[in-house]
A protein has these predicted regions:
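NAD(P)H-binding glycine-rich loop region in Rossmannoid oxidoreductase-like domains
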Residues: 1-18, 22, 44
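Conserved Rossmann-fold NAD(P)-dependent oxidoreductase catalytic core, especially the SDR/UDP-sugar
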Residues: 21-62, 88
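Active-site Tyr-X1-5-Lys
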Residues: 58-88
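Glycine-rich Rossmann NAD(P)(H)-binding loop
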Residues: 97, 119-124, 152-159, 170-173, ...
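Substrate-positioning beta->alpha
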Residues: 100-106, 120-143, 149-153
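Conserved C-terminal active-site "lid" loop/helix of NAD(P)H-dependent oxidoreductases
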Residues: 131, 167, 190-232
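Mid/C-terminal beta-alpha module of Rossmann-like enzyme folds, strongest
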Residues: 141-207, 243-246, 252-255
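Amphipathic terminal alpha-helices
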Residues: 222-229, 233-255
Length: 255
């Protein structure tokens, strides 16, 4: 589970911590010496400041906290045989690709229907990566890296704003580029009101929550330069990635 908010607080820890323990125990029992752990940028927390791999993690959600603990569980496994075991921790931004049914699919659908507007601002920075680039990096790192602990932010560098992402989406797919920006105060009041009504009538409105609205307006300002500095290259630019994703996707599912 990774949708936040969306689950009970304890569910994030049950899933991510027990999952990490199970993986490490399996690796011990089967003499596995390489683990690639897909963490998240959530351990950095929701802050506007740029974050590098050296930044102090300050998670602001149960998901981010549980992922950070899971990283430490994997580090403990590696430390048992530091000269033999290889741990690669990846902190990807929003991952998009065929059948992901997530942020990019929802963005396309909203833009295609003319319902998308910029939430609060246009310059929100959003860390993203194409699934094919992420998979390629995993294979390359597994082959290249030596025993030890290796941490990488897996995001496009330089980072893109939500406006740049929307303009690229419009250019590649032919949907209309959004022009309207709705003030943050209006969105917060609207989300709070709808959630309040939902509680009164016992109904949940999927995707509408004050915390989620706030999340939309905060940058995920993640620095991906370490990848480049260590010789790794992404095969797709943002435009190429969206174009490839669009061609791979079932257009009926996107509408």
């Amino acid at each position: 589970i990774h949708t936040t908010p969306g689950h009970e607080y304890h569910e994030y820890f049950e899933t991510n911590i027990k999952g990490a323990e199970n993986i490490c125990n399996f690796a011990r029992e089967n003499n596995v010496v390489t683990i690639i752990f897909t963490s998240s940028i959530a351990p950095y927390g929701a802050w506007e400041e740029e974050k590098t791999e050296d930044s102090l993690p300050l998670p602001t959600s149960a998901y981010g906290s549980s992922k950070l603990v899971a990283e430490e569980i994997h580090k403990r496994w590696q430390a048992e045989k530091p000269n033999e075991r290889k741990l690669i921790i990846l902190r990807p931004g929003v991952v998009f690709g065929k059948d992901e049914g997530g942020n990019f699919t929802r963005l396309y659908s909203a833009m295609n229907s003319g319902r998308f507007f910029y939430p609060g601002r246009k310059d929100t920075k959003k860390a993203v990566i194409y699934v094919k680039d992420l998979a390629h990096l995993m294979v390359e790192m597994a082959e290249k890296e030596k025993p030890g602990v290796h941490l990488y932010n897996t995001v496009y560098a330089p980072i893109h704003t939500i406006e740049e992402i929307c303009k690229t989406m419009a250019k590649v797919t032919g949907v209309k580029e959004p022009k309207i920006t709705v003030p943050a105060s209006v969105l917060k009041i609207g989300a709070s009101t709808i959630c309040g009504i939902g509680k009164l009538i016992g109904k949940s409105f999927e995707g509408i929550h004050p915390d989620r609205v706030k999340k939309l307006m905060i940058s995920t300002n993640i620095n991906g330069q370490k990848l480049l500095a260590n010789g790794y290259r992404l095969n797709f630019s943002l435009e190429e990635a969206i174009s490839d994703w669009y061609k791979d996707s079932n257009l009926k599912e996107l509408k």
